[in-house]
Structures are given as structure tokens and as C-alpha cells.
Amino acid sequence: MANTDDIYEDRLVFAAYDERVKELFKVFAEGLAQGEPERPSQERFRRALRFAQRARNLAMQAVQQEKTAEAEALAAAPAS
């Protein structure tokens, strides 16, 4: 069964990603409202979105590696 802390960490990463996407969209929409050209604004948004996705994926990998390391340490610990 999954540890509550593990689920909490996963949710934090996804919540942070959600917030970042919201911020990116607001910047994108505001730029369009200010008269920025659509094509460059869209490219900038897409590039920022890719970086946010990459950061989310790397963070999830790190969380997963930490979970694995903790599980291995518990398994290797002598039974009391």
C-alpha cells in the first residue's frame, strides 16, 4: 500500500505544475490582450509549456527514485 507521504509528494508536484500552467496561460492571454503578435506569443507559450512539462517529469522521477531508495533501505535494514 502506498505511503501517505508518497502520495502527498506526488500531488504537490502535480499541483505545482498546474499552477505553473495557469501562470503561463495568464501571461499568454495578457500578451495577446496587449497586442503582441499571435505567432510569437504562441511559440513562447509552447516553449514554456514544454519546459514546465520537463520539470514536472524530472521532479516525478526524483520523487520515484527517492521512494525506491527508501524502500531499498527499509528492506536492507535488519529486522528488530
Each model region followed by its residue ranges:
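Soluble, non-transmembrane alpha-helical interaction regions
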Residues: 2-80
